[in-house]
């Protein structure tokens, strides 16, 4: 089984890249399931029902979120009905939405879990404790478990991947918007990538307008960041090949589409 995961979609340009290239990626690589992180899809912060449906129409089977999940209040109008969307599992009890979703793929089920880190981020419940419980329950239904770990620091992401090695199919990081060069399959069969990168503006800073951020570094004054909409696009993703019987990963392949590395069908 092949799983395609597309990193943080940022703004309208990110959505355009998804609409343009995800169908082409699915045609080329033939993944059985496609997961897209959409937490920055609504002008850099949050998601709306319209955008959620756009991502599904473009080919997503599941949409994951992160620390900006609730930045756009529109999410409260549809999150409980969004059966293919997951917010971080380790939000406190009672927060709307769910942190795990199961997707049917032929005669198999795939569990998709969204987690948020705690180092240099808002302090949610312990992701290690929460995911332990969730994985134990998920493995009663399926050995194929994918985790989008939305976290800031590399050490926390690495620690979680080693902690779960052999228990889940993959742990792939999001949030920093910068792709890392450490894709590997750990000894017990868990695929790992510290950060898959972002999908959206290519010449901005983490997808935002450069000048605003540079000025903030120079004068240390508060500034409102804006998505770099008038820009060239990039898409960051990874393709994971998973053994359907054992749930163990066989390989993980980063995918990058940029003006410097165009897509070839």
Predicted segments with their positions:
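Acidic, metal/ion-coordinating pockets
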Residues: 1-265
């Amino acid at each position: 089984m092949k799983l395609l995961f597309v990193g943080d979609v940022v703004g309208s340009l990110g959505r355009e890249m998804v609409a343009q290239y995800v169908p082409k990626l699915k045609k080329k690589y033939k993944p059985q399931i496609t997961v897209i992180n959409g937490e920055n899809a609504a002008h850099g912060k949050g998601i709306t029902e319209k955008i959620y449906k756009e991502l599904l129409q473009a080919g997503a089977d599941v949409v994951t979120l992160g620390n900006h999940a609730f930045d756009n209040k529109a999410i409260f109008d549809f999150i409980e009905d969004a059966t293919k969307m997951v917010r971080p599992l380790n939000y406190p009890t009672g927060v709307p939405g769910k942190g795990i979703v199961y997707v049917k793929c032929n005669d198999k089920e795939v569990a998709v879990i969204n987690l948020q880190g705690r180092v240099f981020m808002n302090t949610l419940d312990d992701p290690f404790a929460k995911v332990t419980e969730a994985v134990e329950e998920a493995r009663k239904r399926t050995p194929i478990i994918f985790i989008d770990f939305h976290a800031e620091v590399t050490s926390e992401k690495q620690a979680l991947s080693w902690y779960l090695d052999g228990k889940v199919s993959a742990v792939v990081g999001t949030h920093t918007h910068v792709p890392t060069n450490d894709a590997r399959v750990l000894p017990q069969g868990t695929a790992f990538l510290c950060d898959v990168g972002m999908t959206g503006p290519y010449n901005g800073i983490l997808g935002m307008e450069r000048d605003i951020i540079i000025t903030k570094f120079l004068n240390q004054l508060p500034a409102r960041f804006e998505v770099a909409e008038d820009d060239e696009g990039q898409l960051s993703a990874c393709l994971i090949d998973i053994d359907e019987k054992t749930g163990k990963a066989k390989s993980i392949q980063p995918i990058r589409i940029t003006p410097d590395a165009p897509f070839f069908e």
